[in-house]
Amino acid sequence: MGSLIIEDLQEGFGKEAVKGKEITVHYTGWLENGTKFDSSLDRRQPLTITLGVGQVIKGWDEGFGGMKEGGKRKLTIPSEMGYGARGAGGVIPPHATLIFEVELLKVYE
């Protein structure tokens, strides 16, 4: 079983993302072979989620933890913390490692 790899690309200086907080993010996701499968930037539409409650894949719930507003990270997410054996929507194959570049735009009180 692989483990989540978190690389800080840019440190944030705003409020901190913690479990139970609602956050707004931008993201782009790639497969290991470089195929981009999704990007909120391409849609110009950020995503708002509640952190740590299972709304998103486990790699996101853990990967955004401790991040501060304005920060950017690269998350390398093993299959077990992504979509696992089932894959997703015909776009993400089974057992795929996922690579995301994420930006934390806002943490809500």
Curated annotation (Swiss-Prot):
BP GO annotations: protein folding
Gene3D superfamilies per the UniProt record, alphabetical: 3.10.50.40
Alphabetical keyword list: Isomerase, Rotamase
Cross-referenced Pfam families: FKBP_C (PF00254)
MF-aspect GO terms: peptidyl-prolyl cis-trans isomerase activity
Top class in the EC scheme: isomerase
Residue intervals of the PPIase FKBP-type domain: 20-108
InterPro entries: PPIase_dom_sf (IPR046357), PPIase_FKBP_dom (IPR001179)
E.C. designation(s): 5.2.1.8
Disulfide pairings: none
Key word Ribosomal protein present: no
Catalytic activity entry: [protein]-peptidylproline (omega=180) = [protein]-peptidylproline (omega=0)
Family of the protein in this entry: Belongs to the FKBP-type PPIase family.
General function of this protein: PPIases accelerate the folding of proteins.
Protein name: FK506-binding protein
Native species: Neisseria meningitidis serogroup A / serotype 4A (strain DSM 15465 / Z2491)
